[in-house]
Amino acid sequence: MVNETPAPALPSAPTGVVDVTLVTTPACHFCDDAHERLDALDRAGLLRLTTVPAESPEGRALIAEHRPGMFPLTLVAGRHFHDGRIPRGKLARLVDHLRAR
C-alpha cells in the first residue's frame, strides 16, 4: 500500500529552491518516470534534485528512516513526500507551490 501523506510544508530556503531527494532502485519504471519529471523541474530552476541509489549507504539510511512501501522514495526538504509512483495531481500541487514562492 502506498503511503499517502499530505505534502509537507516547505521551509524557505535561502536560495528559494527546495531540495528534493529521489531514492531509486535499478530497473524501476516508477523511478525512471519520477526522475524524468523531477529532473525537468530541476532544469527549470524550481527545485534541486539529488538522486540516491537505494543500495548506497545514504540510500539504505533513508530507507531505514522512512520505510517506503515502494520505490522511488521521494523526499521534499528532507521530509517524506511520497513513495511509489508520484501522482500527477500531487506533483502539480507541489509545482504550484514552488512557482508561488
Show the residue positions of the predicted features.
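Generic recognition of short, well-ordered alpha-helical segments
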Residues: 32-36, 61, 86
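Secretory/periplasmic and organellar redox-cofactor proteins
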Residues: 1-8, 101
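Thiol-based oxidoreductase modules, predominantly thioredoxin-like and allied folds used
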Residues: 46-59
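Structural micro-motif
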Residues: 65-75
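Non-catalytic, surface beta->alpha helical segment in thiol-disulfide oxidoreductase systems
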Residues: 76-101
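Short alpha-helical
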Residues: 29-30, 57-58, 89
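N-terminal beta-loop-helix "entrance" segment that forms/cooperates
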Residues: 57-67
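Local sequence-structure signature of Cys/Sec-based thiol-disulfide redox active-site neighborhoods
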Residues: 6-42
